[in-house]
Amino acid sequence: MNLPSLIPVMTLKGVVFFPQAMLPLRIFENRYQEMLQDILKSERMFAVFAEREISSEDEELNEPPFEVGTVGLVRVSKQNPDGTSFVMLQGVSRIRARSIVQESPYRILETEAFNTIKVAEKLEIREKIYDAMVQNQKLGGDVTQDVLDYLCTLEDDIAFVDLAAFTLCKNTVRKQAMLEVQRLHKRAEMLFDDIMQDNLQLSLRGSCKNQNQDTENDRN
């Protein structure tokens, strides 16, 4: 898909959007309502960039975006009686911000493609990631059977890693770091390490709980 170089953008705190992911949004600010009206008349596309922390007291930019975000396609747009809108945005592609060309009435970025680099035809670590997710489910983690069932149907390794990261990674800074890694194998390794770390914490928590129960039983 050919993307325009100038793309309207929402800069959102704590939201890291990935290609292929579905992001429900409630549009209520005037600037974004105007943006939505404009894009629905054209490509139906806008980008979501996570808002980073202000780097210094001298920085004048409001809502400073990270360098890399994701452009999405509006799949559903429904206006509510109160004037707000419900939007379902599907991620299309990573993009890198080059400059801010407009702030009013809404922000527009000049961007460039930031495509994933896949060196090997087969992602060897994919099976290990899936096994780690199965273990996470058994340990009572965030992985559900629905997540497993959906991810295992994906033939594309890039979509598999991106959707798993979008669904399972809760730390915004870490999630943004995964979004910014171009090499698929490195991104997959980061995802695997996160799941294994979560599994370790869940396992230790379970062991402590069992020990406490055993101690309580001994007292009784």
Regions from the PLM with identified roles:
Residues M1-N220:
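N-terminal low-complexity, acidic/polar interaction/targeting segments
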